[in-house]
Amino acid sequence: MTATRCCLWLLLLGTCMALLLPEAWGAPLEPVYPGDDATPQQMAQYAAEMRRYINMLTRPRYGKSAEEDALGLPVWRQSHAAAPGGSHRHPPAGLPAAKGGTGVSGSPPKPWDCLPCRAHSLPSQS
């Protein structure tokens, strides 16, 4: 009975620690506004703290953070082929679609060099 009670207390303590630890690792707290009657030195210190706070929140994140959303969960990305419209790309406005597998005027193929689709005019079948 005492072993069960000890295990339950350890489980409760572990759960509380697990719930409280992420709060300590979260975003920094916003600096407290010193008030309208603050001295110029206090306002300068507040401005510096606010600048650090904003820089911390808006800094670019590289590596693992770039692969996760705001909650720390992995971001599931669909491939371009699974996106609406498939992997087909159309030429930008004003550029004709290339024919024969080469780009315009014999240059290497571009991403929009493709097989005909609904967006391009197809020969009518009579």
Swiss-Prot record:
GO terms for biological process: feeding behavior; neuropeptide signaling pathway. The modification Tyrosine amide is found at residue 62. Keywords: Amidation, Hormone, Secreted, Signal. Residues 1-26 form the signal peptide. Residues 77-126 are annotated as: Disordered. It is found in: Secreted. No icosapeptide-like peptide is cleaved from the C-terminal. One of its GO terms (cellular component) is extracellular space. PANTHER family: NEUROPEPTIDE Y/PANCREATIC HORMONE/PEPTIDE YY, PANCREATIC POLYPEPTIDE PROHORMONE. Belongs to the NPY family. This is Pancreatic polypeptide prohormone. It comes from Cavia porcellus (Guinea pig). The lineage of its organism: Eukaryota, Metazoa, Chordata, Craniata, Vertebrata.
